[in-house]
Amino acid sequence: MNFTGKTAVVTGGSRGIGRAICLELARGGANVMLCYAGNEQAALDTVAACEALGAKAAAMRCDVSKTDEVKALVDAALQQFGAVHILVNNAGITRDGLLMTMKEDAWDQVLDTNLKGAFLTMKAVARTMMKQRYGRIVNLSSVVGLHGNAGQVNYAASKAGVIGMTKSLAKELASRGVTVNAVAPGFIDTDMTAALPQAARDALLPTIPAQRLGAAEEVAQAVAFLASDQAAYITGQVLAVDGGMSM
């Protein structure tokens, strides 16, 4: 994919899937502004990796649930690179637990980051994208948002909400040349899944027709396609990258 002359804002871009997305966009020539929640060194490492690919990149700490911090992130991207053409909402957290024992804080934290965060960033870039009559917004949902998962009522609600928000905003912005799509990863080999006991990892495989975990790069390639000019006639869609789990 060719992203020469394009600027992308990627939330949660320092590690895992977010890092892979930053590198994939940088590989195509995009300027990358990534935000991170707390791991500054990981963010700087990702910036350096993007620059090694020949791209311009920068990182900024941002709590995506805070309106002023999101505005500062987008303003920084506009000031440094002149425009924002692509937004990838990847920032997300989990606070798993069964409904009967889940604390209200665990619900609020997940919805604030995963759902409100995507709302705030989309709102922050919508005006500039509409004005330039070009934009690509890609939101990271999850197969859990499609099918639910015991012990993840908060995470499932947030990711299902992302899908509904994606489809609604796609209808609002389509006439202005702005597409809004979602990618729903399945079980991807990241730090989060690596922390699972081997027995739990082994139990996952029978639920995946492809019989393996996905790679972060495979999610990134799907995101890059939806962020590209080749996907100009695709909007309001959810692309599952899950080895067939959603069949």
Give residue spans per PLM region.
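Conserved glycine-rich cofactor-binding loop
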Residues: T7, S14-G16
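Conserved glycine-rich Rossmann-like NAD(P)H-binding loop of the short-chain dehydrogenase/reductase
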Residues: A30-D45
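Short, small/polar-rich loop/turn modules that mediate ligand/substrate recognition or access, typified
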Residues: G82, A174, T179, I234-G236
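Substrate-binding pocket helix/loop in short-chain dehydrogenase/reductase
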Residues: L98-L99, K103-L111, L204
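Active-site helix of classical SDR
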Residues: M122, S158, T166
